[in-house]
C-alpha cells in the first residue's frame, strides 16, 4: 500500500562495512531492531546470506571488498532506490593479517591490511559524504582499536592502521 511505502521511505539508513561478524553483525541486528534500514557489506556471500535471512527485507547485503576502489564506487553509485540516502556510515571492516615481526613480516599481507583498514575507510567515506553534505545531515563513525594506542608484539602495521 501507499502508506507503507511512505513509511518505508522515512526509515533511516545505516551503511555498515564488515557486517558479517563481531561488532558489525551485532550493530546491524540492533539497528534493524530499532526500525532502521541496514546496508551491510562483507567479503563472504554465505555469511551475508545467513544474515539477510535473519534480518529480513530492511537489510541489504552487498558482497564486495572495501579495499577495491572501483568496486566501492560502483556499489555506491548503484544502490537501489530506498537505500540511497545514507544517514550513518559505520566504517567497521578491518583486517589484522600479517602480524609478524617487522623484519620478517609478509609485505603483501601488510598491503592488504593497509588497503582494508585505511583505504577502504577512505573510499566509503568519500562515496557517502556528497549525499550527506547535500542533505545537510549525516554521521560517519570509524571503528578503531586500542591497538592504535598500545603497542603489542608483532602488531606494528596493524597498530598503525588503527591509529590512522
Features from the language model and the residues they span:
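Conserved glycine-rich cofactor-binding loop
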Residues: 20-21
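Substrate-binding pocket helix/loop in short-chain dehydrogenase/reductase
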Residues: 100-102, 106-114
Amino acid at each position: 500500500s501507499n502508506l507503507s511505502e511512505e513509511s518505508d521511505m522515512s526509515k533511516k539508513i545505516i551503511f555498515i562495512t564488515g557486517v558479517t561478524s563481531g561488532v558489525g553483525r551485532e550493530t546491524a541486528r540492533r539497528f534493524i531492531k530499532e526500525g532502521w534500514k541496514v546496508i551491510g557489506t562483507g567479503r563472504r556471500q554465505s555469511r551475508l546470506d545467513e544474515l539477510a535471512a535473519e534480518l529480513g527485507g530492511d537489510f541489504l547485503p552487498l558482497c564486495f571488498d572495501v579495499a577495491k576502489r572501483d568496486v566501492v564506487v560502483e556499489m555506491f553509485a548503484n544502490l537501489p532506490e530506498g537505500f540511497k540516502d545514507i544517514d550513518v556510515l559505520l566504517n567497521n571492516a578491518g583486517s589484522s593479517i600479517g602480524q609478524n615481526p617487522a623484519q620478517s613480516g609478509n609485505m603483501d599481507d601488510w598491503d592488504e591490511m593497509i588497503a582494508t583498514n585505511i583505504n577502504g575507510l577512505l573510499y566509503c567515506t568519500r562515496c557517502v559524504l556528497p549525499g550527506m553534505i547535500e542533505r545537510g545531515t549525516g554521521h560517519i563513525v570509524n571503528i578503531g582499536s586500542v591497538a592504535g594506542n598500545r603497542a603489542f608484539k608483532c602488531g606494528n602495521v596493524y597498530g598503525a592502521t588503527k591509529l590512522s
